[in-house]
């Protein structure tokens, strides 16, 4: 029974949305009345031996909304018929806590499950950016929760549990909590879910990996995440595959952007792909190598994949396109500047940096540059 996340029961529980003046509004007991009636009726219908799970937003993380203490108080009115509390958080107005943003720590909600468990002695489930098996094990071992819930992690890798039980953790294709293909598609624009790290999600017939029955050579130019995924897929279906990357390291922009403090989680994706590639004997990787026509021809390719990466979006400022990232210039893209700072970490001290754009990327730049002594505006 979903009693959180701004769904109907949650709207009755929350003082932000429940403005009623009858027996269903006002006090905590009144606001919990609908939840109590629904749960009692479900119990009557299913009998005493059928487990009832109730999901709650233990903290709404909105000014004037229910806090964890409020939640612990209103649960008394309907906890008796509940077998397991599924302890979540957030409302539609605090979506970053409802559908965990990637900057929130792994397993960050577990303290709320612990509080509910300690107050009522009921088994509790926790979830929220639990991507690493050890995090899940630690939560269970400490007794903070009794069950681990996972949604996006199983979209990214439906075999997560099997890989933990039988395989290597490095084989897990971990969710990076970007919320683009899953929540962004389904909730944001009402499209079928996809997944940034798993192209087979809703890929249908186009992504069935069928072994080839004749020799085939594939050349992939670019060793970022797209190039690595293409190269691994080609090798896994039986192609002799060559991947050419001009830089010394694989991973592309994902590996680079993971240098930003709140984007460290992004490194999991290229790391997974590099591990996957390392196990394929018919995949040959050339790093620190320029892809020339002569080299490509020598590989006798049947298929060539151009995965040389994307370019940053630039605002329509006169002269910007012609002058950005020029040698000795003062206008730089985020990727070029991060590369520069990683190579020369002291170079920003005392310098004035103007960031154009206050969206997620602009804020990432501020977070990356300010601690390095730059005067950022």
Task: Tell where the protein language model's regions lie, with residue ranges.
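Flavin-dependent oxidoreductase catalytic cores
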Residues: 1-221, 225, 229, 233-236, ...
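N-terminal Rossmann-like dinucleotide/flavin-binding domain of flavoprotein oxidoreductases
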Residues: 254-301
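Short hydrophobic/charged patches on amphipathic alpha-helices used for structural packing
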Residues: 75, 133-137, 274, 293-297, ...
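A short helix-to-beta-strand connector/capping loop
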Residues: 144, 277-285, 324-331, 374
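Short glycine-enriched, charge-decorated loop/helix-capping segments at active-site entrances
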Residues: 25, 99-103, 258-263, 321-322
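Rossmann-like dinucleotide/flavin-binding elements
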Residues: 212-243, 285-300, 308-317, 334-377
